Amino acid sequence: MIEADRLIQPQDLGQEDVIDRAMRPKLLDEYTGQDDTRAQLKVFIEAAKKRGEALDHMLIYGPPGLGKTTLANIVANEMGVNIKSTSGPVLEKAGDLAALLTNLEEGDVLFIDEIHRLSPVVEEILYPAMEDYQLDIMIGEGPAARSIKLDLPPFTLVGATTRAGSLTSPLRARFGIPLRLEFYNVRDLSSIVARSAKVMDVPMDEGGAEEIARRSRGTPRIANRLLRRVRDFAEVKHDGAISRAVAQSALDLLDVDSEGFDYMDRKLLLAIIDKFMGGPVGLDNLAAAIGEERETIEDVLEPFLIQQGFVQRTPRGRIATARAYSHFDLIKPD
């Protein structure tokens, strides 16, 4: 499996969630990027508040590290309600979910991260809860067992997933508001880096923010992580201020190149170019060649490489594009 301490991996590393919490926007007006999603949410939230109703159930999906948890908390703040957070793997038994549902107050947000990993038993409990605000529970065992219905207050379920295609059709159909998060552009990510630096009281100019953003793979979580490491470098090697030159030196030292690639990205690209003559190469062969799992390539390595035009996914397999060759100062054969 991929190394857990990979600097540019989009998943949370240990205590990062606690550290990042202080840097997260609390309201939609503070939220940068994802313009279409933000505009839609603003309308949906305002409409629900005008009607005095709970917001419709919402599914937020997209690559990791783009702010799904942040958006769920913003929704709760904008609606003026509480949020209870959990994740799919934690909800092992129907009783685990029932305990959460019965403690919700009217309008509250229940946030389930990695919702695609819910067990079928737990998912069955969700259906009537989402549709009718009712909880079906079994009392007793064997022939004497009976089902009773408990009424639940209207609530908003916010599900987050990196694998929307893995959700069952019945569950996916019950979300009235599907929102896809995209990778951030450099301009929006620069604004996020600048905001985080201000929260951290780190002096930084526009060039420094842009350089960190440019190497952050379009992902706020990675940008904030790189900002913390560049801050360390600036404090020890310089006067504490982050300029473009300081950011470049620090990130070069950390082996994060100008495109935001580390050794794993370069390993994947070079495997396609050198071992498979540029492709096409099947996913299983590529996974074996670089010593990684299929899921790691599909969920972690590939999305950004494809989105940035370095890898093309075809029915016959993965192909390295001319841009991938150019990154290594190579010329793609005709």
From Swiss-Prot:
Keyword Transferase (UniProt): no
Molecular function via GO: ATP binding; ATP hydrolysis activity; four-way junction DNA binding; four-way junction helicase activity
Annotated region (Large ATPase domain (RuvB-L)), positions in chain: 4-184
SUPFAM superfamilies referenced in this protein's UniProt entry, alphabetically: P-loop containing nucleoside triphosphate hydrolases, Winged helix' DNA-binding domain
Chief place of localization: cytoplasm
Function per UniProt: The RuvA-RuvB-RuvC complex processes Holliday junction (HJ) DNA during genetic recombination and DNA repair, while the RuvA-RuvB complex plays an important role in the rescue of blocked DNA replication forks via replication fork reversal (RFR). RuvA specifically binds to HJ cruciform DNA, conferring on it an open structure. The RuvB hexamer acts as an ATP-dependent pump, pulling dsDNA into and through the RuvAB complex. RuvB forms 2 homohexamers on either side of HJ DNA bound by 1 or 2 RuvA tetramers; 4 subunits per hexamer contact DNA at a time.
Subunit structure, as described in the record: Homohexamer. Forms an RuvA(8)-RuvB(12)-Holliday junction (HJ) complex. HJ DNA is sandwiched between 2 RuvA tetramers; dsDNA enters through RuvA and exits via RuvB. An RuvB hexamer assembles on each DNA strand where it exits the tetramer. Each RuvB hexamer is contacted by two RuvA subunits (via domain III) on 2 adjacent RuvB subunits; this complex drives branch migration. In the full resolvosome a probable DNA-RuvA(4)-RuvB(12)-RuvC(2) complex forms which resolves the HJ.
Protein name: Holliday junction branch migration complex subunit RuvB
Organism per entry: Shewanella amazonensis (strain ATCC BAA-1098 / SB2B)
Native organism taxonomy: Bacteria, Pseudomonadati, Pseudomonadota, Gammaproteobacteria, Alteromonadales
